[in-house]
Amino acid sequence: MPGARRRRRGAAMEGKPRAGVALAPGPSGRRPSARCARRRRPGLLLPGLWLLLLARPASCAPDELSPEQHNLSLYSMELVLKKSTGHSAAQVALTETAPGSQHSSPLHVTAPPSATTFDTAFFNQGKQTKSTADPSIFVATYVSVTSKEVAVNDDEMDNFLPDTHWTTPRMVSPIQYITVSPPGLPREALEPMLTPSLPMVSLQDEEVTSGWQNTTRQPAAYAESASHFHTFRSAFRTSEGIVPTPGRNLVLYPTDAYSHLSSRTLPEIVASLTEGVETTLFLSSRSLMPQPLGDGITIPLPSLGEVSQPPEEVWATSADRYTDVTTVLSQSLEETISPRTYPTVTASHAALAFSRTHSPLLSTPLAFASSASPTDVSSNPFLPSDSSKTSELHSNSALPGPVDNTHILSPVSSFRPYTWCAACTVPSPQQVLATSLMEKDVGSGDGAETLCMTVLEESSISLMSSVVADFSEFEEDPQVFNTLFPSRPIVPLSSRSMEISETSVGISAEVDMSSVTTTQVPPAHGRLSVPASLDPTAGSLSVAETQVTPSSVTTAFFSVITSILLDSSFSVIANKNTPSLAVRDPSVFTPYSLVPSVESSLFSDQERSSFSEHKPRGALDFASSFFSTPPLELSGSISSPSEAPASLSLMPSDLSPFTSQSFSPLVETFTLFDSSDLQSSQLSLPSSTNLEFSQLQPSSELPLNTIMLLPSRSEVSPWSSFPSDSLEFVEASTVSLTDSEAHFTSAFIETTSYLESSLISHESAVTALVPPGSESFDILTAGIQATSPLTTVHTTPILTESSLFSTLTPPDDQISALDGHVSVLASFSKAIPTGTVLITDAYLPSGSSFVSEATPFPLPTELTVVGPSLTPTEVPLNTSTEVSTTSTGAATGGPLDSTLMGDAASQSPPESSAAPPLPSLRPVTAFTLEATVDTPTLATAKPPYVCDITVPDAYLITTVLARRAVQEYIITAIKEVLRIHFNRAVELKVYELFTDFTFLVTSGPFVYTAISVINVLINSKLVRDQTPLILSVKPSFLVPESRFQVQTVLQFVPPSVDTGFCNFTQRIEKGLMTALFEVRKHHQGTYNLTVQILNITISSSRVTPRRGPVNIIFAVKSTQGFLNGSEVSELLRNLSVVEFSFYLGYPVLQIAEPFQYPQLNLSQLLKSSWVRTVLLGVMEKQLQNEVFQAEMERKLAQLLSEVSTRRRMWRRATVAAGNSVVQVVNVSRLEGDDNPVQLIYFVEDQDGERLSAVKSSDLINKMDLQRAAIILGYRIQGVIAQPVDRVKRPSPESQSNNLWVIVGVVIPVLVVMVIVVILYWKLCRTDKLDFQPDTVANIQQRQKLQIPSVKGFDFAKQHLGQHNKDDILIIHEPAPLPGPLKDHTTPSENGDVPSPKSKIPSKNVRHRGRVSPSDADSTVSEESSERDAGDKTPGAVNDGRSHRAPQSGPPLPSSGNEQHSSASIFEHVDRISRPPEASRRVPSKIQLIAMQPIPAPPVQRPSPADRVAESNKINKEIQTALRHKSEIEHHRNKIRLRAKRRGHYEFPVVDDLSSGDTKERHRVYRRAQMQIDKILDPTASVPSVFIEPRKSSRIKRSPKPRRKHQVNGCPADAEKDRLITTDSDGTYRRPPGVHNSAYIGCPSDPDLPADVQTPSSVELGRYPALPFPASQYIPPQPSIEEARQTMHSLLDDAFALVAPSSQPASTAGVGPGVPPGLPANSTPSQEERRATQWGSFYSPAQTANNPCSRYEDYGMTPPTGPLPRPGFGPGLLQSTELVPPDPQQPQASAEAPFAARGIYSEEMPSVARPRPVGGTTGSQIQHLTQVGIASRIGAQPVEIPPSRGSQYGGPGWPSYGEDEAGRREATHMLGHQEYSSSPLFQVPRTSGREPSAPSGNLPHRGLQGPGLGYPTSSTEDLQPGHSSASLIKAIREELLRLSQKQSTVQNFHS
């Protein structure tokens, strides 16, 4: 050849650039030129080129070639091997001689194209292999391409493709040896190459020869394997090698390049193609490039990386019209594929520019494109590295996409397969097949991807198909998983695809290099392969078809794939030469998109612009116009070739092995077109094409392969048969057929080969077949070529179809995806049947007869399918249906393909003998159809069994025959037994006849598992007879021990599923593997597990809607050996039934149970740990189930775990949940109703220690009986668990009795304890109770009287938080008494609050205290306060309390008259208080207040003066004690404060107050009482005795601190001290007590002075020693106790009345008067000290300043304190100010009375003490009390100082008295009283209280003024606690009552 040099495949190829081999296209029959070229070119190139040329009769002399190579004659091409300037050192340019000039017949042409397998004379020197200058041409008739593993040796491949490593041989071995059919090849070419291995021969002749040497050497092999073509493709994979596209003498990159997919080789090829697009790329449709691609793809995929580079370089530029189209198509195809996985595929479009004229060449580029697609795939998960290359490739090859798309048939699959292939470029077709099978298993486009990846990773065994279909789904082991989902329609396609996959993979790599590779890749799929190999147009279509085919289901995923493919292919095309071609219908990913892609490709071939238009088309358009338009396009674009490829492509589409078919059809089309030069009109046979497409698509599913085979030629053939267009198609078909075979080889390795052989053998037949095949039928027929093969296919397809088709047909995707596709889908299933029918017809009629029919008729039939092509998609369905039953068709389609494959391989060797191949095909079909593509059926060219029986151990049965047994008879007998049982014909495949009779049983493509056969035989008379002929039957595999076995039970299987078939076993194995994998993902465990099915039995063999249950026994093996069944069971039971059912694919009844359960020690010696449970309702069937015991163990363990978890919820449990182990010892049926069953078991804890029966039963019995029954699933009799040894256990009754005993003992003890506590508490409060005895009557009366007030105060108490009404009252009063009250209050409060008894006593005490002190004090204070306060501030307060004031007034006068006994005074007070208030408490309080208020002092002044003198003495005595006391008190107060804060304060305070002053207080109190009696005589006759006793009792009650105080000085002192202490607290308390603040504010003191002015002056006179305040204070000190008592009483009353503003008013009134007076008059250091000590009491009492200062001490100014009640503060202050001048003086005088009052007040305080107890505000009250007392003391230092009460009495009493006086005498309340009462009290009543309700307010008030503060404090106490309107209301009522009483008393006093 010019510039062609034969190079050694090794160094020569790599080292130097090859000279380009140029085959000058001769006019039409320049066979000689071609030959010459070939001759010139050593066998390597020449044979390939010659084959190509032969394929192209026009180029080669048709004379010679046409007879020889029907295929080659189609085109005679010159292979020009030139250096590609830009791209590769050497490019092979194949020139077409006259296109189509020499189609002896379309069939012939078809055959030659096949033969032209690789006239690849071009080396990809491209980027990757520059050294591949070697002009190695791959020439092989497609027939020659043998699926056999004649795989070109690496060396040979290297020779052929020096640059590319001939990895293909491994993968392609069967395929790569595509023998160019002798007819197709030039004789020279043929000579070098055996007809079967013609390509090899060519290679041999030239460098390529080496590459093809194997092929050549093994012509038989070529013919033999349907995958042959696949292999051939593999060989083609070499970028250098020319893909043997049957149609053209297109130089495909060498198989090696493909195999390697080495970039350089492919690039070189691409370059070659690019340069000699016309020549090089011009693969006739017959050129097997797509098919080679299919095989090649498998190989190229591995070298995909390499391929990546060349794409740009390689241009398939046909000089012919196809050039641009080709490029465009390639691009588009590539793009189509690319869009999905590898957009890079589009890269090669530039390089792959091939003229439309050279469809074959274009086909080659398509192959590259296919490679690109694979590259894209690469970019997909599987070929990431390749993917980048793919990009390049994409750009390079326009059509690679299509091939890829073939792969893409399953959108994912297609890509994946490429990737996969790339990984396993070289895997043998068988491997590919396995992959495809895997893919089948995957059965989904998605799965395909996953599978692909795995395959890619693994080896390129059936990579493409598997990858495409299955790998995407299975990440881990695509192969393993592939079988998992055989049902998916994709599987059949996958299997086809798989083979193509391999090629595709190879191409994929190459695709990276060039689009040709891409094209090839799809062929590898079988479907995809075709598009790749197709010319650009064909490629484009091919892609579309491929996509359709690759889709899981041709039909279903046809739409899906179509879009994918289309997208890929289009994009490739668009990128490449023709933007139009680059239609990239990839964008149209819809099925329509896919179709448009094909159309686009076709159009691109025809017109790039048109292609571009097509691209826009939707997949639907593609689908419908795929046939119609693409053919048209081809025709128009590439006169015929371009369109023909489209048509072919469509046909492949139609077929599930769409790629291969598409490829071959495309190639054929090109061939037809080229050779026939069919014009677009012919191609444009849109209907036929479309129809074809639809049919193909139906075929595509499974049938696709079959159809592809047939359609390749047969489909095209019909078209050829029809008009020239038809003829073109036929020719293309023929080529396609060859291609189909190649494709089949790719998709179904064997099938492809078979078709090739068939075509070669029966070109005419093929042609005939094709037409009859119409679309799918034709294809099938063509594939069948030999009728018998077709028939075989038909049968097989049906079976396969069923399984596969079930998968495939179901796909709605196809239908939904595209109308056409939908139709196709329907058509597919129908088509398959049709194919079957046609096949049958074709088979019987034989190719020629069919040809006659087919061309006109079958084609019409096909036309029926095809004719409606546009509709046809549907029509094909109809046609299919018509031709064959839809079901049959569906079943057949896939199987057919498989069968075709098988046959193809077998037929390929005997080109002439089509029938034998068909049978092979049938098995292949079954294989393809079955997901079992994995079976090496492909490799075997034998019937494609659905399972791989190369390692038949799982299926072999070994029997020992009796001596007398005759083997022939035994075989017959066994067959008969099995036939009867299985209800179908079976065959025995005997492996060994001697010694042991070893055989396996098959039925058609199905293989029966050994165990299913053994189960039949052992129950037959052959074994069971008395004199059995068979002594023993056993499987050939090793059965593990029972402890390793696990049993799973399926509920049922559908009647269509035969559990005896190997595919069912494989599916279950895969499901179990998947389940184990899923479990192991979440549970650490052994990996690399394998499942071995040991037995499968089904209970009911009769055919029913559901056959079951199915028992499956299996073992799991790891690297260390078999796993224990219990371990496997435990592992699998982590899955739910639903999950496990999902993995197995059938509903599961029992997940996994071991045959042997581990048992613990069941010895009788451990019977003590046995527990017994009786279940009810256990049926015998359940009981007999061997799993019953295990289930009960698990449920009991669950029960225990639940108990332990619940226990942990109650308390930390000792038993860990879920770790208990239950071992059932015995399960026995008991007699009785309701089917009782006794379980005897024992429990071990997590540590393996056995629990005793008692402990176990106790633990279990903690569970609720109902819950236990739910868990166990059965009702339980009696107790849940009972120890076996002692069935008698304490009955629930006895247990309950025990409980009662416990309750009877514990509860009484508790009750006693409670009583003791209460008694102790009461005893603690006995002090208060002591007060009660003082005046029982008073108490009772007061209680009665106070009931209302109590109620009111109770209400307030509740709000305040006080426990008792009394407490509340006390609180109120105590609040007024800052210090003493505090002390008393605290105790009393504590007492009262703590216990009701204390409350009552406190009430009584309060009343009594109030009565005596309050009477006396109130009398005095009221009088004084009435005068002072009355004068000062009588108005409002008195008005407000006028009612009470009058009442209290009389008592005051009477008290003024002096009652001899404090009791009388108190009684009087009580009486007074009763009338106004229902409760005495309030009245007494009022009286006390009234007495406290200065009004009383005026009355008392005369006697008080004396008393004052006495009190001064006492005060002097007491002061000393008081000082000490005050210190002590201060300390105690602190303690109390702490206690109080803790809630104990009030009580102790009371105790201190009462106890401290007991004796002295009694003494002083008596004096004061006497004074009070005098004062109170008029109003009340309360015996002072009572008061004193009360006082004493109170004092006794009150803590000894009080006595200590007395010891220190007067009780008042003590209290003052306390108050002082409290004062510190007082600060706090003051705030609570606004009253105190009032006092402090000096309002109360001023008020007192106002009222007491006279008395205070008198008192001052009496106590001149004391400064006005001081002397007052001092004199009162003796009477301070009394005053204190009085104060307490008053405070109590005040607290009771606290709410009433009368007290505040009095306080205010007094305060105001006093403060000024006190400051000026008396601020004795003593007083101040006291004041400081006492806090609010003394300081206020000592001086007005002191009160204020005391507040200041507290840090609060009196007014500030009151600020919370500004009205009060100011009011008090104002009143004070009003009073001040007088008050000071009066105060001095008043102090004496106050001193008396102080005495009273002391009693009052005592009374008050209890009340404070009542108050929850205790602390506040105490503070208030202190503050108030202090202020009062400050106001009236005289008496008040000595005793808190008395001190306070001056001012405080007035204030308190004011409350009473104000109430009793609105005016008489001391001016200050009234005044303060009016502002302070009113405010409290109205808003003051509420506002001051906050404790804060109270304290402030306390600060304001002693008097004011006091009332306020009491009020406040209520308020803070309650601060609610109701509380205020109650307090107001009380105050009203008190004020009324006070006013009365005051009036009386006055």
UniProtKB/Swiss-Prot annotation:
Record's comment on post-translational modification: O-glycosylated. O-mannosylated by POMT1 and POMT2 and elongated by POMGNT1.
Listed transmembrane segments: 998-1018, 1299-1319
Bias type Basic residues, positions: 1-10
Ranges for region Disordered: 1-37, 378-402, 875-919, 1373-1463, 1702-1740, 1837-1923
Residues the record lists as Phosphoserine modifications: S1388, S1395, S1554, S1555, S1624
Chain positions of site Breakpoint for translocation to form KIAA1549-BRAF fusion protein: P1643, S1644, S1749, R1750
Bias type Low complexity, positions: 879-894, 904-915
Pfam families according to UniProt: KIAA1549
Primary localization class, coarse: membrane
Residues modified to Phosphothreonine: T1622
Compartments, record wording: Membrane; Cell projection, Cilium
Family per record: Belongs to the UPF0606 family.
Function noted in UniProt: May play a role in photoreceptor function.
Name the UniProt record assigns to this protein: UPF0606 protein KIAA1549
